[in-house]
Curated annotation (Swiss-Prot):
Protein name (record): HTH-type transcriptional regulator GlnR
Taxonomic source organism: Bacillus cereus (strain ATCC 14579 / DSM 31 / CCUG 7414 / JCM 2152 / NBRC 15305 / NCIMB 9373 / NCTC 2599 / NRRL B-3711)
Gene Ontology terms: biological process: negative regulation of DNA-templated transcription
Pfam families given in the database record: MerR_1
PANTHER family, alphabetized: HTH-TYPE TRANSCRIPTIONAL REGULATOR TNRA (PTHR30204:SF65), REDOX-CYCLING DRUG-SENSING TRANSCRIPTIONAL ACTIVATOR SOXR (PTHR30204)
Amino acid sequence: MKEDRRSAPLFPIGIVMDLTQLSARQIRYYEEHNLVSPTRTKGNRRLFSFNDVDKLLEIKDLLDQGLNMAGIKQVLLMKENQTEAVKVKEETKEISKTELRKILRDELQHTGRFNRTSLRQGDISRFFH
């Protein structure tokens, strides 16, 4: 499921309670601690996304493992940072300015001037002439 679909607000708190086996008070408590951020309707009702439900289930699992709120916050923060690092790494696959300068410098050294053909072009051109 795409990320934009997973973050769409769909579920009222009653459905989330059934899905997670958490009480409304527990869910509101996690919201107060900024662990989940449900969207509010015009009538001020909470609507939770798939991501919110996943996070609540993860919180429940961490509680079952014996972690307290501070530990849960650390685990979720580390997981979020790791996810962001992966996204940043994927986005920065482009060539850096330093690498680009090095490639251009090498190319200019091979050609000597802008008007001459590079050695690479010369090597390739012999196959076509």
